[in-house]
Amino acid sequence: MQEAVLPKVCRVVICGAGVIGNSIAYHLVRRGWTDILVLEKGRIGCGASWRSSHLVGQLCPSVEGIMARASVLFYQQLQESGHSIGWNQCGSLYVARSSRRMLSLLRLAAEAKARGVECVVQQPKTLTSRHPYVRVEDLVGGVFVPSDGLVDSMALCRTLAMLAQEGGAKYVEGCWVQRVVSENGAVCAVDTSLGRVECENLVLATGMWSREVARSSVPGFAVPVHAARQSYGITRPVPEGIPDSLPVLRDYDGRMYCHREGASRFLVGGFEETAKPVFTHDVPEKFEFLQLVPDYEQYKSTYGQFQQRCPSLENVQLAEVVTAPETFTPDAQSILGEASEVERLYLAVGMNGAQSQFAGGVGRALSRWIVCGAPQAFLLPWDPRRFIDLHNNDQFLRERVQEVVGRRCLPPHPLQPEWRTARSLRCSPLLPLLEQQAAVTGERMGFERALYFERGTPVERPGRATPEPSYGRPDWLDNVREEYTACRERVGISDMSSFSKFYLESGSTAVVEFLQKLCSNDVDVPVGCIVPTGMQNDRGGYENDCIVVRTHHNRYFMVSPTAQQTRIGRWVQQHLPGDGSVSLRDVTSLYTVLYVLGPKSRGLLEEATGSDLRHLQPYTYQEMDLAYASNVLVLGYNNTLEPGYSLYVPSEFALHVYNRLMKTGRDYGVLDVGYYTLRFLRIEKFVPFWAEELDSSVTPLEANRSARVKLQKEYFVGKFALQEQAEKGLRRQLAFFQLREHDWDTDPWAWGQEPIFRDGQFVGTTTSGGLAFTLGCNVCQVSEQPNWGEKEVPLFPHRVL
C-alpha cells in the first residue's frame, strides 16, 4: 500500500494516517489535488483510530453538530457505494434524569432539526420501546435520533486510504515526522526519519504527538493539547443475545454511554468528572496498536452507572477494559485550521475523543480551506488562533485536561460554567479589590474578569466555581439588575482590561494608508478622534470589529475584542507592508481599562480629573491626569452605547485611579459592575459583538452597520464584495426580537443559538439574548433571512414570538 521512497517535493504533506488524516487526504483528492503525501510513523490507523468506541452522534451544539452531520452523510454515502466501513445506522437514545437535561436535549434537537436531522422526543414510558434494557423510573424523558450510528474506525481508515491512493495520493508508513521547517513565516518543508520533503502546504494530524513535533520545529509553534486516560469496557456475551436494532444509549447525567458490540456484547464507556493525564513529560516515540494498563478503580463508576441504568444486565460481567490515551484541548473544542505562527501549516488535532464522529466533516472542511484559501465561518470556535502562549504551558495543560474530559457531559449553554482548574493566570491589578467586593469572576483568554457582584451575603463555592447556567431566569439576575440600574440612573464602573490592545505606527504617514486599506470606515481623521470600524475580508465579512484611535499623525491605538488577541494580531501582521514601514505592537497588558457608565459619569470624572469634559465629545479622546496618575486616555466611547467613558489607565496607576473614582463616586451612587450587566446593556441597545453576531461571513450591511462603511474610499479590503451586496440585496440580516407571550420569570429564555422558524421552515438563528430591564421582556439578536412575518423560537415547553 505504501510508497518505499519519499518524494523530494510535494504540494501537500499530511502527517498522520489516522481517521482524520485519511479523511483530509481523501477529500483533497476529491477536490482535484493529487500531489499529496501522507506520512505515518507506524501503520495506518495505529494510533487512536484502532481503539475508537465507534460513536457518531449528531445531538451536539454549533460546529460539533455541523461536523457530525457531515460525517453521517459521508459515511452513509461510502456504505451505499459498496465500501465496507462498518456503518451501522442504529440511532441514539439520549435520556434525561432532570428537567434541565431534558430542556438541553430539546434545544439541541431544535438545532439538529435546522440541520436536517430527524429527532423524536420521547416520554419516559416510551423509552423502553426504543431500548428494552433501560430503567425509566428516574428519567423525565429523552430524544431519539434515528440517523446516528456506529462506524468501524479501522475499516474507515483503510477505505479512505485506499480511495485516496486510487486518486493519486502517496502513502509512506514507518516514517517519523521530526520537525516542520518554515521560512519567512510560511511552511516550506518537513524533516522526517527518511529525509526532507519540500512542500507548499502541511497538515499536522498527529494526535498526541503533535506538541512534540511543534516543539522540535524550526521555528516552533503552539499546539495546546494533552493526553488523558480514557477507558471503555466490553462485556461478556448476553445469553439471550441483543436486538440488532438496539440504539446507542447516552446517559450524560450518569457520564455513561453503551452500545451493542458484535452480536451479544455491550461496549460501555464514559467521561470521568476528574480525568487522569498521561505522558506528562514525554510522549512515547512508539505507541503502535498499544493500550495503557487498565485502571479498574477509575472505570468502576462508569460500569456502575451502566448497571444502574440497565438493571436487567447487572449480572453481565466484564470481559475486558480497554484504556488508552486520548488527546484533549484546554477548552474542550477541537483544533482545526492554520497555525497562528506559520502560514500554510494546518492543524487537525485535539478531537477530544471524537475522531470518528468528526472525521468526515473535518476532512471536508479543511480540504475546502486549503484549496479555497479561507475557512468557513462556522469553524471559528475551532480556530487555532483562539489561543495565546499560556494555553501551551505544560503545567496549565496537565491541570486543565483533568477537567476537560468531563465537560463532554455538561449541558451546553452559551454561558458555559467557568473552568475551575488553571485559573488566576492573567489578572488586572484591580482583581483583589474586586474580589473583596464579592466579584464572581470568569475567564476569557486566561484573563480573570468580574461577571457580577454578589452583594449581601456571598454564596460559598469551591475554587472559582460559578453557578450552573440556567436556561431560564439565572440565579444572579437580581445582582445584575442592581448593576444595570446603577448604569442607567447613576454611575457604574467596570474593569474591562481584557480587551486586546495594539499600537500601529510608522515613521511617516504610511500607517494611515495601511489602515485605510484594512478598515472599511474612514480612519484618516484628525488626531484625537475615535473611529469604530470593521476590518473585512475579500468577501466583505468581518475579520475584526474594533475601534482605532488616532493618537498622533503617524500612530493609532487599536482596541479589539478579548478573543481576538492572537487572531487579529496575526491577521494584521500578514498584511503589513513588506518594507517594514508600519509596525504593530501588542500592548494588551500595558493598560487597565475602566468603563465609567451612566448619566452621572461626566460629573464623577470632572470631579476626579479636575477637568471640564464638555469639550470631550463622543468619538473623541483626551490624555489627562486623574488624581496623581498621568497619561490616562479618556475615550468618549464605550461599546454599550450608554452615556459614559472608557479610561485606558497605565497599569501601574490602576489601583490609585480606581480607588479615587470609587471614593469620589460615593456622592454619585457609584457601583461596581460586571460583564453580564454590560452584555445585557449592549443586547438591549442592539449592539452586535464579535463571535456572536459578527464573524467572517457576516458583512456590515447585514449587521446594520452600513454607516461604518465608506464605499466612497478609493479602496479597502472587501469593498467590491460590499458594493456588489449593496446592489444585489441581502441574503440575511441582523434583527432584534422582543419575545411575546413569554414569562421571563418562569419560562426558558433565548440565550443564543436557538433556531428561528417561519411556517415550520428554518429561517435564522438567535445569536445572543438576555433580559431588557427597561423594556421588561426577554430580548435577543437574530441572524435571519430578510423577510417579515410571525416567527417562532422553540424555547420549550413553549414556542414564543
Model region roles, listed by residue range:
Residues A17-G18, N22, K41, T206:
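Glycine-rich Rossmann-fold phosphate-binding loop(s) that bind the pyrophosphate
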Residues S23, G57, R179-P294, K300-E314, ...:
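Flavin-dependent oxidoreductases
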Residues V29-W50:
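Glycine-rich FAD pyrophosphate-binding loop
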Residues S53-R130, D253-C258, A263-R265, K286, ...:
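Dinucleotide-binding Rossmann-like beta1-alpha1 core, especially the glycine-rich loop
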Residues F74-Q77, H83, R97-G174, Q178-A186, ...:
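Flavin (FAD/FMN) cofactor-binding and adjacent substrate-gating region
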Residues F387-L801:
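Glycine/proline-enriched, intrinsically flexible loops and inter-domain linkers
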